[in-house]
Amino acid sequence: MPSTERVAKVVLVDIEGTTTSISFVHDVLFPYAKNNVQKFLEESWESSSEVKQIVRELQQVPQYAEYTATLRVPPKEVDVQVITGFVRYLIDKDLKVTPLKTLQGLIWQQGYETGELMGHVFNDVPGAFEAWREAGLRIAVYSSGSVAAQKLIFRYSIVGDLLTHLSAHFDTHVGHKQESQSYANIAQSLGEDPSHILFLTDIPGEAAAARSAGLQTIILQRPGNTPLTDDQKYSNELIADFSSLHTLQLPE
């Protein structure tokens, strides 16, 4: 079915490589968190119960033992220096660990609120959001980044506040993005038949997982995205941007 004839009730969008450039995430957000984590922890270590909980959760992930084993002197206690080093270790390895994502979101929040950060979105995103909302569709987000971090990108975007267009947010608490059950969980949470949800992503494995749960899927080929193999191109519907989806309509 051509994109121009497609119907749906919900558009579920990925962020990195779909609404937002991969370079913004990897070249701006990740370095910002890495460079500011020690200062953030020093300021909140004693005063924030949320940070204390994140620190406890970080110590429970499998990579924590791996990291401490690499240290010349094993730490006798957990302190700012140890957690700072571990967070930077996780960022360098691009590991999608839930407490890391939560901590990054808190650090980024400070950056957005001070104006040091502004969320990148591609030029076609605002118009598509408006068109889908006007057509009566709901827009939801599913990203490995925490819900808080998702909201910051759209609230403090380079084109202004886009958060009002979004009706739901999902992160790894609902499941990993290449697992079919995650998309079944999202459909259940949204109260929609999976076939009425259109998932937009740049990752073939995510698209395959969503399709196996009954969702419609399209893969974005944005600048900077990982090139697709011939088999991936053949087995997926592909678009370069959202412009061909402005005519999305609700099912009759």
UniProtKB/Swiss-Prot annotation:
Mg(2+) binds at D14, E16, D202. One of its GO terms (biological process) is L-methionine salvage from methylthioadenosine. CDD domains: HAD_EP. Its EC number is 3.1.3.77. InterPro entries: Enolase-ppase_E1, ENOPH1_eukaryotes, HAD-like_sf, HAD-SF_hydro_IA, HAD_sf. One of its GO terms (molecular function) is acireductone synthase activity. Keywords: Amino-acid biosynthesis, Cytoplasm, Hydrolase, Magnesium, Metal-binding, Methionine biosynthesis, Nucleus. One of its GO terms (cellular component) is nucleus. It is found in: Cytoplasm; Nucleus. Substrate binds at S143, S144, K177. Binds 1 Mg(2+) ion per subunit. It catalyses: 5-methylsulfanyl-2,3-dioxopentyl phosphate + H2O = 1,2-dihydroxy-5-(methylsulfanyl)pent-1-en-3-one + phosphate. Bifunctional enzyme that catalyzes the enolization of 2,3-diketo-5-methylthiopentyl-1-phosphate (DK-MTP-1-P) into the intermediate 2-hydroxy-3-keto-5-methylthiopentenyl-1-phosphate (HK-MTPenyl-1-P), which is then dephosphorylated to form the acireductone 1,2-dihydroxy-3-keto-5-methylthiopentene (DHK-MTPene). Belongs to the HAD-like hydrolase superfamily. MasA/MtnC family. PANTHER family: ENOLASE-PHOSPHATASE E1 (PTHR20371:SF1). This is Enolase-phosphatase E1.
